[in-house]
């Protein structure tokens, strides 16, 4: 059986983080899960494109907008399943076995963890994971794996710069189930803006969007 999953990664000047993200996908290739990686670039001026090509990824380009980039990226894929992963997210070792065991149960995401120490990082991640469990509304930082048919029926990602992940999650018929494997994501925005301020901003955006 051919590998079922196409991976889509949106990038915008992501050269510093992209190699580690791509490296974490290698176990999915070894497990026969991943058939292709599509990098959807929003006009990077750094080496993001060169890095993607060096790793064997396909590149699609267009205007910088997370939703638009993801929509273009998914449109370029051929797999029966789609995995969406941010360019600063590293999947925990062992993720491929968990996906392989659970994917027939429907769409899934990973458990959020930040590449940062301290109580604030753990608290924000715990809240995000609880929200995913209760409402089936993971953020894009947690990754997403779903059938292409479910994606198509949902209407796909809207071309919008924010909350595109929540918009898609709300339109999917099946609840998104969280797996124990962690998606370790960068904490730069939280560390620059402050954990409390950034967390409150995200919550406010979510409440206004819903």
Residue ranges with predicted function:
Residues 93-120:
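Conserved donor NDP-sugar-binding/catalytic core segment of glycosyltransferases
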Residues 150-154, 160-178, 182:
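A short, conserved alpha-helix in the catalytic core of glycosyltransferases
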Residues 23, 33-43:
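Short beta-strand/loop segment that forms part of the nucleotide-sugar
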Residues 82:
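Short aromatic/hydrophobic "clamp" motif used to bind/position activated sugar donors
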Residues 61-77:
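Glycine-rich, basic loop-to-helix element that forms the pyrophosphate-binding segment
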Residues 13-29:
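Short, well-formed alpha-helical segments that are part of the catalytic scaffolds
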Residues 4-6, 36, 167:
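Cell-envelope/extracellular polymer assembly enzymes that use nucleotide-activated donors
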Residues 41-49, 89:
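A conserved acidic beta->alpha catalytic loop
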């Amino acid at each position: 059986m051919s590998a079922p999953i196409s991976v889509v990664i949106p990038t915008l000047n992501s050269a510093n983080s992209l190699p580690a993200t791509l490296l974490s996908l290698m176990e999915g290739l070894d497990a026969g899960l991943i058939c292709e990686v599509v990098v959807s670039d929003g006009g990077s001026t750094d080496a993001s494109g060169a890095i993607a090509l060096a790793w064997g990824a396909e590149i699609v380009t267009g205007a910088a907008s997370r939703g638009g980039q993801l929509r273009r990226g998914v449109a370029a894929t051929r797999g029966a399943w789609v995995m969406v992963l941010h360019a600063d997210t590293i999947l925990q070792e062992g993720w491929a076995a968990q996906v392989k065991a659970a994917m027939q149960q429907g769409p899934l995401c990973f458990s959020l963890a930040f590449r940062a120490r301290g109580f604030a990082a753990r608290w924000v991640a715990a809240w995000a994971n609880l929200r995913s469990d209760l409402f089936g509304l993971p953020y894009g930082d947690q990754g997403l794996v779903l059938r292409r048919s479910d994606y198509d029926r949902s209407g796909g990602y809207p071309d919008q710069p924010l909350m595109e992940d929540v918009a898609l999650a709300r339109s999917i018929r099946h609840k998104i189930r969280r797996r124990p494997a962690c998606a370790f994501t960068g904490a730069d925005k939280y560390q620059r803006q402050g954990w409390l301020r950034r967390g409150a901003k995200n919550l406010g955006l979510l409440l206004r969007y819903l």
